[in-house]
Amino acid sequence: MSISRLTFSFDSSGWLYVYHLGVAHYLQRHVLPHLEAERVAFSGSSGGALVAAALAGGIDIEQLAHHVIGCHGRCRFNPFRMLPAAEEAIAKYMPPDGHLMANGRLRVLLTRVRLAWMRPLFGPEAVSEFASVAHLRQVLRASCHIPVLGGVLPYQVDHIGTSRARGASRGYDAGYYDGVFWPSVLYMWRAFDASDTLFKVSGLGWPTAHIRPPLPLPLHWVCLPPPPTTLWRLFAAGYDDAARRLHGEGGGRALPDGVRAALPPPPPAHAAPMPVWLIALGWAHLLLLTCLFPLVPPYLACRELLQLQGRGDSKTAVLLRRGLLLAPLLAIWPLVLAYLVTRWACGRVLRELIALHDEGQAHATATSTRDAARREAKRI
């Protein structure tokens, strides 16, 4: 017989999982010590799966946050380094018995790739049983496997345990992509049982989440992290938002009386660490990147080249410098293509208009000639 549990579910987030870490830090300090382990569960997708696994495995969240934000320097202008940084964190902090603590308490959302007749190519899958700590690491890495940034081919997971949640796979050596944003209405992946009390956490600010930023955060922060000071503001915002939600009437009723009484007073609303102007500045940055999209790849490549030269990595810098010779051509071709298509379309429209004008002129001339001939005939 299944027991009703308190389940915290973390959405896909990319670098915005720093907000998730702030929420997790509050839970680890003020909520989880007052709950029995079998009464609480976690679920997550992509970066949210890493945070959920950290809570299930008893990892020090504050120490993990310092490591994650410390990777900002090498990942700021190179989104391809985001997943190697995640692999490094998983290998460094996941305890040897992490799979034992996660079994039955952690659900990880994946996107399975199937090549079969009369079956969809992509589909959601939730994994909650882990054969070993290596298997747990593979599942977490697969849930973060963003296409292109992590590779074109799906990430291979060697083994899926025989005891699985509903909807899990039945095979070996399966290929997976990032868990992305599978709606809970289509696939019930967040909780273990329908009787569970669910708290949804979203770093992107989805309106259906229980704990979320007050305003939607800029989307490019998912792959291109903001400065470390802004990341620490995100961490503090997650901590404060969790405190306000769980201490309020909406979230407090879901907690046992002893847990709610032990919670510290939430911070005042006016002490929010994420000012509106900072979020607005991020959205303005995203708008600028969107307008100047053809110039973004060479810009990021130049910044990466400067960092490589600063670290003395001359061999990689030479390769990147040669690649920059082709980068402007690759970046300008969308503008050239748009210009050619627009010119062709406008030229065709102009030719049609000119033809219609000439036809109208000819028709008017013919009509006036006929009218003149009729008047001349009547006069005769």
Report the location of each language-model feature.
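Patatin-like phospholipase
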Residues: 1-43, 53-380
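Gly/Ala-rich beta-loop-alpha elbow adjacent to hydrolase catalytic centers
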Residues: 44, 48
